[in-house]
Structure formats: C-alpha cells, structure tokens
C-alpha cells in the first residue's frame, strides 16, 4: 500500500506549458489520469497496455529524482558510473512495478478534488480512486514539480 502511494504520488510531474499554477496542476493530473484510463479501458493485450503505461510514466514522472530520493544520503557516496547504473536499474524497476500494478485496473474512476500550492516549485493535487467490489477506495496525492514550467513532472 505504501509503494502504491509513493508511485501514485510521484506519478504526476508533468509536461505542461508556461508557469504552472494550482489550476494547471490539477488539470495536468486529470489529463494524465485520462490518458492512463484510456489505455486501461481499451480492448488490447496486457502487454500493449503495459507498454503504453510505461510511455505515460516516462512522459510525466521524474523517475531519476525519485530513484535518488529513495537512496537517501547513500547517493553521495556513489561514483558517477554507479549513479548511472543505479538510475538505469531503478527506471527499469519503477516502470515495471508501476505498469504491472496499474494494468489490473480495467476502468479506474479517479476524481481530482483539491490542490495546494506548497511553493513556487511544488503543488500537491489530491484525488480519490473510487472503490469497487474488487478494490478499496484509495486516496492519491500527486506531488507536482513545477520548477521547469515547460515540463512539470510528478
């Protein structure tokens, strides 16, 4: 459950234009949700869905930043070669884990309900994955990194 929250929390560091305001952050999140929902609702193979979900994640998530954040202070002791190798391995792990978890949702119904500007660089967007008979309701907080207005990321 904790990994799910982390994956979803980081899932929306976006690709928007100009300076990102809170309304733009929630629109970005909703847009990303819609892209993923469209893939998950299509009548295509699981493998193709996974491939498409990985593309969405690569477009919207700062996987490298998440990976180094996960390492904590250990990252300071790594050589440049180790950092490059770690980044490659973490990206592969992240994309595989993320897509395999999401692909089981055939028709996710996610509502964006709130947003909060933390700073000029960060906006939190709150959403709710509505529960069904098969899965519980899940709150999802999206941390949007807006330092680069040309390409905000989760």
Residue ranges and their predicted role:
Residues 24-102:
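Early exported N-terminus immediately downstream of N-terminal targeting peptides
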Residues 9-19:
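Bacterial N-terminal signal peptides
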Residues 96-141:
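Surface-exposed, charged secondary-structure patches
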Residues 137-154:
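Short beta-strand edge/turn micro-motifs at domain boundaries
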Residues 1-8:
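Bacterial N-terminal signal peptides that target proteins for export
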